[in-house]
Amino acid sequence: MKHAFLIMAHGSLPLLRVLLSMLDDERNDIFLHIDRKSDMLDGVEPLVLSKARLFVLEQRVDVRWGNLSQIKAEYVLFEEALKHGPYAYYHLLSGQDLPIKSQDYIHQFFEEHQGKEFVGINHGEEFEWDCRRKMMRYWLFTSLTRSKYGALNAITRRLNKYLSMLLMPFLHRQKMDFAKGANWVSITQACVEYVVSKKPFVLKRFNYTFCPDEFFLQTLVWNHPDFRAALYSEKDEYEGCMRLIDWKRGNPYVWTIADKEELEQSNRLFARKFDMKHEDIIRWIKASYGALS
């Protein structure tokens, strides 16, 4: 059965071209969502892949960091991919991700672990506080949190903080255990169908929260006994989703050629993030793990 790769892109077209070329395999269908604010579409539309089918989504969400719009963009991808399925796995990637294993390796890995859900769960010490702060309080102006105007960012942060404290008596009411983790996942057909079926609940409950994309899918999986039992790993958030992401050296760290050995020795399947400013590591990854390697 084929795999579906769901890509959320907004920035570098050259890097996106590398990612698409590395996923260009007859066993893959690729679904591409380009942020409505981005001007990348003109550069993407002429692209024709030789083996994989590429679907460039017409419905484009204006994605804002920390805002419900990120969840809406994910739902656009999940819903479009379901129309063309079923698929063995649905892989959610950003436009700044790259595979760090060959397509043969990736497909073999998921065949050996068929039925597992690759969803990272964060059990860190700050989870409870983060959950109360982001999920229980009301956040009213998250669409302006990262405006291109620096002064507006500062004003919005202060206003959000003030209003969230003012509205403390009117906290969101939770009737489930929240879970948190990276929004980059690889999940089964059954899991995607379930996530899509819960869309009305998700859009209502996670509205006026902060960074809900870190919580919604993990919460759905965590509260479903079958999907929770199928989690690949609960011990490590990024082992759980098989992504190599370094938050200790950056937000997240941008991989360079100096990290070649770490990338080469990692057991993870995908890594982020990359930047064309460090083109040498990107060229090395493409040569090592590209579709023709």
Put a short name on every predicted segment.
Residues 1-293:
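ER/Golgi luminal nucleotide-sugar-dependent glycosyltransferases, focusing on the catalytic module
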